[in-house]
Amino acid sequence: MISVLFVCLGNICRSPMAEAIFRDLAAKKGLEGKIKADSAGIGGWHIGNPPHEGTQEILRREGISFDGMLARQVSEQDLDDFDYIIAMDAENIGSLRSMAGFKNTSHIKRLLDYVEDSDLADVPDPYYTGNFEEVCQLIKTGCEQLLASIQKEKQL
């Protein structure tokens, strides 16, 4: 099974939103048994907490389930266990590469790296900006392109 880990700073806004949206997209394409998704945060401040209320509100409005999602911190083991590690911004990438040390990091990329015509490289953090709508649109586009890339690469 192909595995995808979405990573943001605290695992309550962007990465759980991406996990939920990606799962929904994969399910709609009949890929539930072929691709699994998870999310984690660089920091451990929110471990055990559900997604931020702003993330929950957007996902509810979109009709996308986030049942059972609780924040967790990314681990070194995750770097080995996941085929794709998808970070939300350059700071997350730096933290993940530092954690990896001398291990291969070619499977660690930013979500918006998959969006060819994006003016942005990073998904902004709505925890600080409150712009959950904009972030949701960026994440949706990124997840659609990521899934298409995985389907092409893995011939799904």
From Swiss-Prot:
It catalyses: O-phospho-L-tyrosyl-[protein] + H2O = L-tyrosyl-[protein] + phosphate. Changing residue 8 to S: Completely abolishes the tyrosine-phosphatase activity. The keyword Hydrolase applies. Keywords: Hydrolase, Protein phosphatase. Pfam families: LMWPc. InterPro entries: LMW_PTPase (IPR050438), Ptyr_pPase (IPR023485), Ptyr_pPase_sf (IPR036196), Tyr_phospatase_low_mol_wt (IPR017867). The active site is at residues 8, 14, 125. The keyword Transport does not apply. Optimum pH is 6.0. CDD domains: LMWPTP. Efficiently inhibited by Cu(2+) ion, Zn(2+) ion and N-ethylmaleimide, while the addition of Mg(2+), Ca(2+) or Fe(3+) ions has minimal effect. Inhibited in a competitive manner by vanadate. Changing residue 125 to A: Completely abolishes the tyrosine-phosphatase activity. One of its GO terms (molecular function) is protein tyrosine phosphatase activity. Induction: By ethanol stress. Expression is sigma B-dependent. Dephosphorylates the phosphotyrosine-containing proteins. Involved in ethanol stress resistance. Belongs to the low molecular weight phosphotyrosine protein phosphatase family. This is Low molecular weight protein-tyrosine-phosphatase YfkJ. It comes from Bacillus subtilis (strain 168). The gene is yfkJ.
